[in-house]
Structure formats: structure tokens, C-alpha cells
């Protein structure tokens, strides 16, 4: 009997533990919280900021919607780094040591809306980044070491409304990249060493249309060339830009035609401090201004009309002159004929008198 009682008690305890475990799995507020993190089930947020973490914690609660990982030492994000928190909506990775953003690290986050990666050491982002986060609305890449951004994202970033890249090392920004963000309403570009040459004309044209349609931007301030140093890109007239030409095999591709500068007869090669040619500069051959066919046709028509009018006026003047001369001659001829007739009659009378 005693053994049977002990067996029954053991089975009852196991059943209770199993029930408690099942309830713990079903309740979103119950579960493990990563060490050095603060979990707030009421707001579905996990705060792991300022804990000296070198990697993303593994045991994050599946109910996490907001994840704060700023002020750590995270330098690398593995593939599917956040697969355990598929409901994640806001991710803060600012002030870490990230040098690259791999698209694979963000796979499995269809609900991510806000991504903050400011104050890292980012050198570039992958062109497939938009594929990994199609629902992203705010992307902040400020205060990094970005020197170049992808020309194209491969597909439109349909939902992005905020794009911030201020305080980086960007020299140029391709217009095609911004055109892939049809819903963007805020673009932050300040504090980059923008080279306002022919390569930045596309960005200027895009910004003009963007601001005209109600978009907001802090503008791009030129670092080079010297005549435009410190001036806003939008304030430089279009006429000072020369179209960029494709680099020739016989000519060094490191030369640049600066806005407002006269074309050079001989190209001069420029090398950077390492002795290599700078691929960011190119010589733009001046092209003749394209002829406007409509203006040419109008000029020809107007010239023809003017010439026709002049010819008609000359013809009218000639006719008038001839008519006037004929009439004048006719009136002047009558008195002369009468005088001659009178003279003849007088001579005849004189002869008749002499004969008599």
C-alpha cells in the first residue's frame, strides 16, 4: 500500500510539472529571458543595451516586438540571426562594431519596420538588402563609414519612407537607388564629402522633383570642386554641369570635368596618395549643345515670311516707280509736243510770208 501511494504521488507530481510547463509555453509573458537583458512582456520589448555583448543573444522570447541591442560590441551578424523573433518590428543596433550588413542576417523578419544601425563601422550594404526586408519603413545608416551605396536594389523598396545616410563618406549617390523608393518622404544626406560634378547631376534632379512633390531633405553640401565648396547642391545651376562621357581606353578614366570649368585641350592624369588613379574622377568631354529642331523650323519659317514680305515690298516699289515715271513722262510730253507743233506752224507761216 505504501509503495502504491508513493507511485501515485510521483505520477501526480509529474503531471503537475507537465501542466505548468505547458501553461508556461502558452503564456507570452512567461519564459526565459536572456542573461544581461531586461524583458518587458507588457510592451513585448527586450532591452539588452549597454551590456558588452559581442553577439546577438540566442534565447530571445518569441513574443519580442522591440529589441534594443545598442551600445554593445557586436561586430558580426550571422545568417538568420533573428529567426527566433519573427514578430520583431523595431530593431536598434546603433553604436556597435558592425562593418557589413548581410541580407541573410535579416531573413525571416517580415514584420520589421524600423532598423537603426547608426554609429557603426559600416563600409557597404548589399544590393539584396531590400529583398530581405520588404516591409521596412525606416532605415537609419547615419554616422558610419559608408563610401558607396549600391546602384540598384534589384527591386523597389515599396514601403520605405525614411532613408538616412548623413555623416558618412559618400562622394556620389546614384539616382536609380532613390527612384527605387517610391514612398520615401524623408531623405537625410548632410555631412558627406559630396563631389558636385557631373556624376551628382542625377541626384540634383531627383532632389528637385522630390522637394517639389513635398518631400523633406536636409540637402547635400558640396565638398568639391573648390568653387562650390560649402554650397548646397540644389543651388548650383544646371548650366554649369557638363554631361559625363564614357571612359575611353586611350584616355585615363581618372579625370573629371568640374562644373563651370572650361574644357582642357590636353588631359592631365591625377593620382592619389597611393600612386593609383582615383576611379571616382573622369574627364567629361564637352559636347555641343543639341540643336532644337522645333526652334530651327520656326526660324526657317520666320525667315521665309520676312523674305517674302521684303520681296513683295520691293516689287510694289518697282511697280509704283514705273507707273509714276510713265505718268510723269506722259504729262511732261504733252506740252513739249504742243510747243513743237506751234513752232512748226510758226515756221510755216514765216515761210509763207517770205514767199508772198
Swiss-Prot record:
| UniProt domain LRRCT: residue ranges | 192-246
- Could you say which residues form the signal peptide? 1-32
In this UniProt entry, which residues form the Cytoplasmic topological domain(s)?
A: 321-356
Ranges of the LRR repeats in the UniProt entry: 63-84, 87-108, 111-132, 135-156, 159-180
Sorted alphabetically, the keyword list is: Glycoprotein, Leucine-rich repeat, Membrane, Repeat, Signal, Transmembrane, Transmembrane helix
Stretches of Polar residues bias are at 255-277
For this protein, the record's Pfam families field holds:
LRR_1, LRR_8
List glycan-bearing residues: 92, 116, 159
Q: Where is this region: Disordered?
A: 255-288
* GO CC term, one of those recorded: membrane
Q: Give compartment(s).
A: Membrane
Q: What is this protein called?
A: Leucine-rich repeat and transmembrane domain-containing protein 1
Topology check: give the Extracellular ranges: 33-299
The LRRNT domain extends over 33-62
UniProt cross-references to InterPro entries, sorted A to Z: Cys-rich_flank_reg_C (IPR000483), Leu-rich_rpt (IPR001611), Leu-rich_rpt_typical-subtyp (IPR003591), LRFN (IPR050467), LRR_dom_sf (IPR032675), LRRNT (IPR000372)
Tell me the membrane topology, using the record's own terms.
Answer: Single-pass type I membrane protein
Task: Tell me which Gene Ontology terms the entry assigns under biological process.
Answer: positive regulation of synapse assembly
> Coiled coil: which residue ranges?
none
**Residues that span the membrane, as ranges:** 300-320
